[in-house]
Amino acid sequence: MQKARIKLSSTQHVELDGVCDQIKAIAEKTGVDMAGPIPLPTKALKVTTRKSTDGEGSSSFDRWTMRVHKRVIDIEADERTMKHIMKVRIPDTVQIEIELRN
């Protein structure tokens, strides 16, 4: 049977976990084997900008950080389960990638 690897990423971990819980509930309801959600390391993207735009005065900086949270779910890809997963409402802040493998 084919397997599906579902990769989820988001800057909002609460919404990401909500989508993972919905997929987990679908897998339990349809009775397919599932592994995950496996949390991958959080990537922290950092940007430092200078507060003063004219270059005069003391050097003071703003530090901005964006954290990207990732999860991986491996699931058996039967037709009924995949139809239910495709109908899950996914927030705009969550990116999803589904890869089918044999």
Curated annotation (Swiss-Prot):
One Gene Ontology cellular component annotation held by this UniProt entry: small ribosomal subunit
Gene3D superfamilies: Ribosomal protein S10 domain
Highest rank taxon of the organism: Archaea
Source species taxonomy: Archaea, Methanobacteriati, Methanobacteriota, Methanomada group, Methanococci
Alphabetized Pfam families for the sequence: Ribosomal_S10
Ribosomal protein recorded as keyword: yes
Keyword list, A-Z: Ribonucleoprotein, Ribosomal protein
Keyword Ribonucleoprotein (UniProt): yes
Organism this protein belongs to: Methanococcus maripaludis (strain C6 / ATCC BAA-1332)
Name of the featured protein: Small ribosomal subunit protein uS10
Family: Belongs to the universal ribosomal protein uS10 family.
Entry's Gene Ontology molecular function annotations: structural constituent of ribosome; tRNA binding
GO terms classed as biological process: translation
Self-association and partners: Part of the 30S ribosomal subunit.
Task performed by this protein: Involved in the binding of tRNA to the ribosomes.
